[in-house]
Amino acid sequence: MEKIEHTTISTNGINMHVASIGSGPAVLFLHGFPELWYSWRHQLLFLSSMGYRAIAPDLRGFGDTDAPPSPSSYTAHHIVGDLVGLLDQLGIDQVFLVGHDWGAMMAWYFCLFRPDRVKALVNLSVHFLRRHPSIKFVDGFRALLGDDFYFCQFQEPGVAEADFGSVDVATMLKKFLTMRDPRPPMIPKEKGFRALETPDPLPAWLTEEDIDYFAGKFRKTGFTGGFNYYRAFNLTWELTAPWSGSEIKVAAKFIVGDLDLVYHFPGAKEYIHGGGFKKDVPLLEEVVVVDGAAHFINQERPAEISSLIYDFIKKF
């Protein structure tokens, strides 16, 4: 880890913390919630050893990157704008793009808005979400899964913050990062995420040192920046009306664990394997379902995921 360089880049009106290592073709890694650049620590080291320039920022609202206070500052347009500006500042014309969780969602939008800047895409966990012409994203989730669905619970400012603040940050991160129940998370307001089981001991792939790194950053920032991605998602729906029905025109590979909660959302498997995904992403070359892996797959199965990424991008 000591070889990883840390810099701050000014982009799109914010200061962005960026971790990077290596030289060669650039690979841009986008993390999810509740995570940081650190979620890609294994992939950074592996891809750099294979002759790539591996770059992983803390996204807007996370870690050592600025966190604007308003939820309306966290649309896909803001996040993609940050990343295009980052590439411009680094003098990089095109990248291989790798995303997970919210990072995967933003990677889909990056490819939708600026396919000219992407050589190829590897996304983990979160498939492309087709824009319904009349139903906003969060409204659709609420209709399908009800108010207790975690995505809906994160909408009201202050509520999720109080829930996450009711236990120590390290304990909450242990609960969240080790979730293995593949069912969509239903979190009754009176119980909250604090009711989730705390693993003891931690799984082999997540150390106390890892938790300490994540917790040290989230103790400083809180979780509001991350929650704001959920709170801005209906606004993203409004702003992406011009792209309604558009296809992703980038060569892509998709990887998901068979215990990933997103893989078990209503209709997800049918979309991924039944032709809808390939229709929306016509250059989708491969879907890999990893047996026995849950949501935080890049950390749980680092060697396997690193190899799957490398095997795809080396073709370009």
Swiss-Prot record:
An epoxide binds at residue 150. SUPFAM superfamilies: alpha/beta-Hydrolases. It comes from Siraitia grosvenorii (Monk's fruit). Keywords: Hydrolase. Mogrosides, the major active constituents of S.grosvenorii fruits, are a mixture of cucurbitane-type triterpenoid glycosides that have been proven to be powerful and zero-caloric sweeteners and can hence be used as a sucrose substitute for diabetic and obese patients. Epoxide hydrolase involved in the biosynthesis of cucurbitacin and mogroside tetracyclic triterpene natural products (e.g. siamenoside I and mogrosides IV, V and VI). Cucurbitacins have cytotoxic properties and exhibit deterrent taste as a defense barrier against herbivores. Mogrosides are nonsugar highly oxygenated compounds used as high-intensity zero-calorie sweeteners; they also possess pharmacological properties such as regulating immunity, lowering blood sugar and lipid levels, protecting the liver, and acting as antioxidants and antitumor agents. This is Epoxide hydrolase 2. Highly expressed in young fruits 15 days after anthesis (15-DAA). Also observed in stems and leaves. Residues 25-302 form the AB hydrolase-1 domain. The keyword Hydrolase applies. GO terms for molecular function: hydrolase activity. Its EC number is 3.3.2.10, 3.3.2.-. It comes from the Eukaryota. The gene is EPH2. The active site is at residues 101, 230, 295. C.sativus and L.esculentum expressing S.grosvenorii genes SgSQE1, SgCS, SgEPH2, SgP450, SgUGT269-1 and SgUGT289-3 accumulate siamenoside I and mogrosides III and V, thus providing a strategy for vegetable flavor improvement or for heterologous biosynthesis of mogrosides. The record marks 150, 230 as: Contributes to the formation of an oxyanion binding site for the epoxide oxygen of substrate. It catalyses: an epoxide + H2O = an ethanediol; (24S)-24,25-epoxycucurbitadienol + H2O = (24R)-24,25-dihydroxycucurbitadienol. PANTHER family: EPOXIDE HYDROLASE. Homodimer. It is an enzyme of class 3 (hydrolase).
